[in-house]
Amino acid sequence: IITDPSYANYMAFAVSCGAVIKPVKTNIENGFKLPSVEEFEKQITDKTRAILICNPNNPTGYLYTKQEMMQIRDLVKKYNLYLSSDEAYRASIYTKRPYISAFHLEGIEDHVILIDSVSKRYSLCGVRIGALITKNKEVHQAVMKFCQARLSPPLIGQVIAESALATPHEYLEEVYDEYLSRRNFLIDQLNQIPGV
């Protein structure tokens, strides 16, 4: 189950693996808030294995509240599901609302699969280096089998990612401030357009 809209490649990845995606619609009228528990439950069957969220959401930018994350946690517990949480954009939050990682949800620690990427945080578009992080040993072993069946990410991407991870934190703060300034400028300009 995924919220819709969401990152377009989720659907392609799922189809290529033989999985079925069940979308739960969000809407612009309420700012893309998480749909009700009942909307999720309408999609849950005995074949449902996971809920996949992107937090903050791509493409809407919506950041789930603590209450919404607790609702997802409760669904995961109630139906014995996994929660896959793509948190690649967590360093790109420009509001005062707190960011709640799926890893901070008590009671489902063994059911959380966190997805991360260096390309978003370090502006490395096209460098496909990321991480799948879980405390679940069975999921970890299954992922390792898949990883060992493949070769490896391109060497140049690995070198770039390693270098990026050594970047001083001050640089990331400067980049954040620059993006925040650009965001605020764009919002100011859009607000000056009648009807927008």
Predicted regions and their residues:
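Short beta->alpha connector loops at strand-helix junctions that form conserved
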Residues: 4, 23-28
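A short helix->loop->beta-strand "cap" motif at the edges of active sites that frequently abuts
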Residues: 19, 78-82, 108-110
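Structural detector of well-ordered beta-strand residues that form the stable sheet scaffold
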Residues: 1, 22, 84, 113-115
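Conserved PLP-anchoring active-site segment centered on the Schiff-base-forming lysine
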Residues: 1-14
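PLP-dependent aminotransferase class I/II
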Residues: 111-195
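Active-site phosphate-binding strand-loop segment of PLP-dependent enzymes
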Residues: 26-97
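Aromatic/hydrophobic pocket-lining residues that form π-stacking "cages" and hydrophobic walls in ligand
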Residues: 10, 72, 102
